[in-house]
């Protein structure tokens, strides 16, 4: 077995343990607003989710969206999907489903947060097509990004389009 992989995930008992006795007491004292939890994977394809899809599944995303309420959308890291592609994805998912698109690697890895206004504008225009199904976008920096470059992150966040 490779770490983190199993031959047949259908044989795993994913039953959650009982709540700790103090959980109800602590939650009863909470005065916070309601919140939603979104759970999903980084991809929905059959190769990465071996054994997840029932035999004969014709459309992975449609089935995936019956089991999870979100997806960490890695596809946007490599290229920007067309408005038509985003519409197709949206139509295959239920109303409360969210897409959490990763910011393109052109911003994070190639330009390393320098002179990215044009790419960020294109990215923002693209992901706005998710409409109500757009979750939070996120940035994954290169593994050799250093603390000395934090000023780039500050500028990037400051300049980020407010509509996203």
Range-by-range predicted roles:
Residues 1-164:
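Residues lining hydrophobic/aromatic ligand-binding pockets adjacent to catalytic sites
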